[in-house]
């Protein structure tokens, strides 16, 4: 199952790198993600190259000429979309949990369900790339509701459900934000 946001532009060979990695590991217990190139300079933690933030100002030529020049390592601990997981695993854990809708906290929650099923590969493949326009759908929604859900509400739901914060799970279990490729 490949999960993606509705505001992503998939760059050449994005799928090749994901499929190749799946073939290499010979396991159904994985979570592979592509790295996002952000069109919104306020988003941190990804690659940055402004090629537009709407369909109207999208500079496809600029993006295609420059995306391969951006450097980043592969790393473990990813919770980013787009991500690829085996269909059997997706069905076993029930996919995304509805209590996190419209999305805030849903990725770490899915990762926790996968962790509890024994998944220890949560790898972002830096050569598999997408351009992210910056939460276009969410920008159209009630900003006060999303801001509340994005932060404290999502963290509270996660804490009550799993007995730890999203930050604790990402830091001590997934070891997110560190460049490493060893099993967790």
What are these model-derived regions, one by one?
Residues 13-31:
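Conserved donor-nucleotide/metal-binding helix-loop-beta segment in metal-dependent transferases, i.e.
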